[in-house]
Amino acid sequence: MKDGLIRGFMLTKKPSFTSPGEFTVYRNIVPSIAFISVVATLGIAGAVARGADNDRSGDFAAAASAGACGGLPSHDALRAALVDARGQANGGFNLDMWGAVVNRDGIVCAVAFTGSDRGRQWPGSRVIAAQKANTANAFSLPGLALSTANLWAAVQSGGSLYGLQHSNPVSTNVAYEGPASAFGQDDDPMVGQRIGGVNVFGGGLPLYNARKQLVGAIGVSGDTSCADHNIAWRTRARLALDFVPGGVSARGDDNINYQGIVSVPSLQADFSHPICKKAGVDEVSSISASLPPTRK
């Protein structure tokens, strides 16, 4: 477009002049007019491009509100379940939490936190929660559930999924878009958009409805990764989206397999996770082992 304007200006027939003064005016003013035209045109093109980006963002948000998140918890439902789960014994440091839900296409449907305001949780855990949800959705199937905790051992050097954690990066534009005052609210800027990302420690779980359909995933972050897993598990159960068809834990679901407890070699060891100890003490493995069973 810019080149066309310049060519058009250069090919314009030079007018006749009746005095040197008229030529001077032509020489000084016309290039300025051409420059202004180019700048204006580029500005319009930029505005159109920005409008297209805004339209795409609006399309995602409209899709979320129009049914793409149907069957998944609302912001209020997610927060209520998350608060209830966080209030139980989960190990860790009993910290406030972030939670996020994505649908099967990886679109964020809800983001919430348990504290009185967004600063009561680790600010960085908002994006981590969404990243965990994206991971659990991205690497689970209708017949096989994988929690983010199940991925830890497999992505270590020499593991069967080594390097997975570096694939599918977080969309930083989505992660940090919008006013911070909206973070964790029903209009969180991530809602209606794809966050991406791969996280390989505890806190992300796939979501299966009563028909055993894989409908998305939940991610929880804000404490030790083991506590995150336990809180995510209780939150999913509270939401009745835990009709898990099968998994790699000893009991055939997507529960965490703790290293040092599962036998070696075994499938569970291949998809295991370290115990989150405090001052060298294991206070969490017994909690994870006693989590409510998934629905059948």
What residues fall within each predicted segment?
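Bacterial N-terminal signal peptides
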Residues: 33-43
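Bacterial N-terminal signal peptides that target proteins for export
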Residues: 23-34
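Signal peptide processing junction and immediate N-terminal pro/mature segment
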Residues: 44-55
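Extended rod-forming repeat segments used as scaffolds/tethers
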Residues: 9-10, 35, 235
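Intrinsically disordered, low-complexity segments enriched in serine/proline and basic residues
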Residues: 1-8, 15-18
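Flexible, solvent-exposed loop/hinge segments and secondary-structure transition points
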Residues: 53-296
